């Protein structure tokens, strides 16, 4: 049963890794929407106190968005490829334009969840109403022929998000809530429009600057997906067999289940890869060509003998497009 569950999780992992990034971004957005709804129901409680409302409302919108953004940056493999590139090669082979595009890719993917959080927060309007209710101009409020009483206006307005305040001012409370929710939702829709325009322009710029045809770009994407899946699967088997060999040398035997016995028999491991080889296949990769032939990854480049003491130096390759 445990093996079946593990196999199902492995299948789901490979399934999502093999799909287009837009599907993944959509799932991230849906998860963020659910989290925001849960937060609004369970954790959001406006203090309804002057000065505190503003800090609490902005914190409720900004801090979760910042946390989601940092998590997105941390979970993006390109982030650590860029770190490795700076550590091992000082990014000497990356020109300004590809580096900018790569950073844009990292930040763009990391921004999906925080932008979704901010948009949903603004469309709901609760945090915005909480933050700005005390700053509404009392002289602009009217309920019939009556104006808002100027005495203690800030304290009264700060209590409106909680439905509190003098009973004779309930009409003003509804007007304040309606006005601030209008502003909040307006900003939310504007944010959606700005993000949509930026995504459209980024896609256009990417395809306009790409020297590759659509079919070759699709092939390159398929190659990267397949290489990553095969590499991860092979690395798991290699590490398991190597661990079994080392345990056998220490104890004189190793307790293996049937699947592990088949792996050890079918895939004998004699040694490990030296650190320079790992460094050679790790880091930022740009589409490059060598003598007119494409090199689709650092592993592909290493396999062709074009790194380290290989037959061709890095500078004969042409950096064309970021991944």
UniProtKB/Swiss-Prot annotation:
Residues 14-39 are annotated as: Central pore. Residues 214-251 are annotated as: Intersubunit interaction. The chain crosses the membrane at residues 22-43, 53-76, 102-132, 180-206. It comes from the Eukaryota. Residues 145-152 are annotated as: Hemichannel docking. InterPro entries: CALHM. Keywords: Cell membrane, Disulfide bond, Ion channel, Ion transport, Membrane, Transmembrane, Transmembrane helix, Transport. One of its GO terms (biological process) is regulation of microglial cell activation. It catalyses: ATP(in) = ATP(out). The keyword Ion transport applies. The keyword Transport applies. Residues 1-21, 77-101, 207-323 are cytoplasmic. GO terms for cellular component: plasma membrane. The record marks 168 as: Not N-glycosylated. Disulfide bonds join 46-130, 48-162. It is a multi-pass membrane protein. One of its GO terms (molecular function) is monoatomic cation channel activity. Residues 44-52, 133-179 are extracellular. It is found in: Cell membrane. Pore-forming subunit of Ca(2+) homeostasis modulator channels. Mediates ATP release from astrocytes and ATP-induced Ca(2+) influx in microglia thus regulating neuronal ATP and Ca(2+) homeostasis, synaptic transmission and neuroinflammatory response. May form intercellular gap junctions. The gating mechanism remains unknown. Homo-undecamer. Two undecameric hemichannels can assemble in a head-to-head manner to form a gap junction. PANTHER family: CALCIUM HOMEOSTASIS MODULATOR PROTEIN, CALCIUM HOMEOSTASIS MODULATOR PROTEIN 2. Belongs to the CALHM family. This is Calcium homeostasis modulator protein 2.
